[in-house]
Swiss-Prot record:
This is Thymidine kinase. One of its GO terms (biological process) is thymidine metabolic process. Belongs to the thymidine kinase family. It comes from Bacillus cereus (strain ATCC 10987 / NRS 248). Its main location: cytoplasm. The gene is tdk. GO terms for molecular function: ATP binding; metal ion binding; thymidine kinase activity. Keywords: ATP-binding, Cytoplasm, DNA synthesis, Kinase, Metal-binding, Nucleotide-binding, Transferase, Zinc. It catalyses: thymidine + ATP = dTMP + ADP + H(+). GO terms for cellular component: cytosol. PANTHER family: THYMIDINE KINASE (PTHR11441), THYMIDINE KINASE, CYTOSOLIC (PTHR11441:SF0). Pfam families: TK. The active site is at E89 (proton acceptor).
Amino acid sequence: MYLINQNGWIEVICGSMFSGKSEELIRRVRRTQFAKQHAIVFKPCIDNRYSEEDVVSHNGLKVKAVPVSASKDIFEHITEEMDVIAIDEVQFFDGDIVEVVQVLANRGYRVIVAGLDQDFRGLPFGQVPQLMAIAEHVTKLQAVCSACGSPASRTQRLIDGEPAAFDDPIILVGASESYEPRCRHXHAVPTNKDK
């Protein structure tokens, strides 16, 4: 990262599932703690895959988190001694998350968000594209395609081992039982003629 003389900015960590987004968010939070900065981590209540009160990476790293139902609930937990606000699975938050993140950065907090930039269909997911547009720093991570070994920028949803259809519900919380990382060429979404 670059030397920043002003307090308050936004960092977005994005990519497909299994690309290391939560792991990178945890790493950045731990670095702030080593620097004696005060950090707080948030996650949406819907994300209960591994834990209800921790952000947990697929490889088992974890950090304590405050689960919240709505974006604006984040404000209730912020205190003046905080330096860093981290938010995992940001794609699951409501539309107010962009305003919340902007307000926090404008108040002088370093705001780190992590989330999927594309849904299982390969389309922009939730508010992540807007957050990427207003962020000072964007880190786009890639996984390894489970079909061919190429860099994977997409998330393949599987239902009984087969690709999910384009019109299936967007949100289905899951892990390796429901999703695989895929490259552009090995990603399939039935009924979508562009894929």
